[in-house]
Design a protein with these regions (language model features):
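N-terminal low-complexity or amphipathic/hydrophobic leaders
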Residues: 3-80, 105-106
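Short HxH-centered metal-ligating active-site micro-motif
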Residues: 61-117, 163-166
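Flexible, glycine/proline-enriched loop segments at strand-loop-helix junctions
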Residues: 85-92, 138-150, 181-185
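Active-site glycine-rich loop that binds ribose-phosphate moieties when present
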Residues: 94-98, 144-168
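Histidine-centered catalytic micro-motifs
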Residues: 109-126, 177-180
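Class I SAM-dependent methyltransferase SAM-binding "motif I" and its flanking Rossmann-like core
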Residues: 117-152
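Contiguous mid-protein beta-loop-alpha structural module that forms a pocket-lining wall or clamp
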Residues: 157, 161-212
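Conserved small/polar residues in nucleotide/adenosyl-binding loops
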Residues: 229-236
């Protein structure tokens, strides 16, 4: 599978400090049999094709059919082992993103997951779920805060199935409380349209932003300060 488009998308969004608050984020591309997902420990801004991890979609699908123990420690240990067993990459030292299973659940070719300051100003805010529906509509799926790993994937699996029954289509935009945004589509161009649409709607709710031009000296410091002050401004300036 050609990963050049995935690499370009990853580098583009990963290079914008307004989209990757505190680093992090991940991306993927898939066909009917194989998922390529960002490797753990890599950076979106600089990731190369060889740093994505190849995984079997059939094995990932089997995880959703597995009956794991109720005990958190035992469940997550077995779940992690099954995720690693789904890795088909020739380089067995690679570890997939912790959200690989969630990427596999989306019924679209490309998936983008980032932590934009504007989005996190919403998802980390007071009354966020209600505000999300008010500003973005019901077709943006909201997921309440929960444990990462299998628990998150299971909840998303159930919510995504319920969404399809209600709307007659698959989820393309998903918000995680206190976390970030997932956007899925069959083309990178459509991901851009969906992502920009969310950002545009949130920008209209911002009453003011901070001026940090005199408070920083280096480029690195300025990027960090802009990310932080934008988040603080958005947390207090959105109509909560």
């Amino acid at each position: 599978m050609d990963l050049s488009t995935l690499v370009k998308m990853s580098n583009t969004y990963g290079s914008n400090p307004a989209y990757v608050l505190a680093g992090g984020g991940n991306t993927s591309v898939k066909d009917d049999t194989t998922l390529y997902v960002k490797g753990s420990g890599t950076q979106l801004a600089t990731i190369k094709s060889e740093e994505f991890v190849e995984m079997s979609r059939a094995r990932l699908n089997e995880i959703m059919k597995t009956d794991y123990p109720e005990d958190d420690v035992k469940r997550e240990s077995l779940y992690l082992a099954d995720v690693m067993a789904a890795v088909t990459d020739a380089d067995k030292t690679k570890r997939p993103s912790v959200e690989a299973l969630l990427h596999n659940l989306f019924a679209y070719t490309y998936v983008l997951h980032v932590h934009p300051t504007l989005v996190n100003g919403l998802t980390c805010g007071k009354g966020a779920k209600e505000l999300s529906e008010q500003l973005l509509g019901k077709e943006v799926l909201w997921i309440d805060i929960c444990k990462p790993g299998y628990t998150l994937a299971r909840i998303c699996y159930e919510k995504m199935n319920a969404y399809k029954e209600e709307f007659g289509k698959d989820v393309q935009v998903l918000l995680l409380q206190n976390h970030g945004i997932f956007v899925a589509a069959n083309t990178v161009e459509e991901i851009g349209v969906l992502f920009d649409g969310v950002i545009s709607k949130l920008e209209k709710q911002v009453k003011r932003t901070a001026d940090v031009s005199d408070a920083v000296t280096s480029e690195k410091e300025q990027a960090a300060a802009v990310s932080y002050t934008h988040l603080r401004a958005h947390e207090t300036s959105l109509h909560l």
